UniProtKB/Swiss-Prot annotation:
It comes from the Bacteria. HAMAP family: Ribosomal_uS8_B (MF_01302_B). PANTHER family: 40S RIBOSOMAL PROTEIN S15A (PTHR11758). GO terms for molecular function: rRNA binding; structural constituent of ribosome. Part of the 30S ribosomal subunit. Contacts proteins S5 and S12. GO terms for cellular component: ribonucleoprotein complex; ribosome. SUPFAM superfamilies: Ribosomal protein S8 (SSF56047). This is Small ribosomal subunit protein uS8. GO terms for biological process: translation. The keyword Signal does not apply. Keywords: Ribonucleoprotein, Ribosomal protein, RNA-binding, rRNA-binding. Gene3D superfamilies: 3.30.1370.30, 3.30.1490.10.
Length: 132
C-alpha cells in the first residue's frame, strides 16, 4: 500500500514521460489525484485522463503529451509539500516556477489550482509541487 499517493502519481507520470510512454495505467484513484490531473490538462502538460474500474476498484489512466521529436512536455516534477512537511504561500507570495516557464500546483480554499489561477482568484494555499 502506497502511503503518499500524490508522490506516487508524480513519480509514475515522470518515469513514463522519460520512457516516452503514451499512456500510464493502473494509478489508484483518488479525488485529490483527479483534481491534480485536471490542472495538468488545463495547463497543457498531459492530453487527458480516464477513470477505469477493475474488480470494483477505480483506477486512473493518463495520456501523456509529447512535443516535436517525441520530447516529453512534462520534464520534471518537484514535490514541495510532503506529509511530514507542509509548505504554504500567501496570495502575494506564490512563487513563479522557472521564471514563468513552469507551474506550481496549490491546494486552496477554491480547490486545486495552478499558480496563475490562484493569483487570478486572489487565494493562497499549500504548494503541492512545481512542474516544468
Amino acid at each position: 500500500m502506497v502511503q503518499d499517493t500524490i508522490s506516487d502519481l508524480f513519480i509514475r507520470l515522470k518515469n513514463a514521460s522519460h520512457a516516452r510512454l503514451e499512456r500510464v495505467e493502473g494509478i489508484p484513484y483518488g479525488k485529490y489525484q483527479e483534481e491534480i490531473l485536471k490542472v495538468l490538462v488545463r495547463e497543457g502538460y498531459i492530453k487527458g485522463y480516464e477513470i477505469e474500474e477493475k474488480e470494483g476498484k477505480k483506477y486512473l489512466s493518463v495520456q501523456l503529451k509529447f512535443g516535436p521529436g517525441k520530447q516529453p512536455v512534462l520534464n520534471e516534477v518537484r514535490l514541495i509539500s510532503v506529509p511530514s512537511r507542509r509548505i504554504y504561500a500567501k496570495k502575494n507570495d506564490i512563487p513563479k516556477v522557472m521564471n514563468g516557464l513552469g507551474i506550481a500546483i496549490l491546494t486552496t480554499s477554491a480547490g486545486v489550482l495552478s499558480d496563475a489561477e490562484a493569483r487570478q482568484k486572489g487565494v493562497g494555499g499549500q504548494i503541492i509541487c512545481y512542474v516544468w
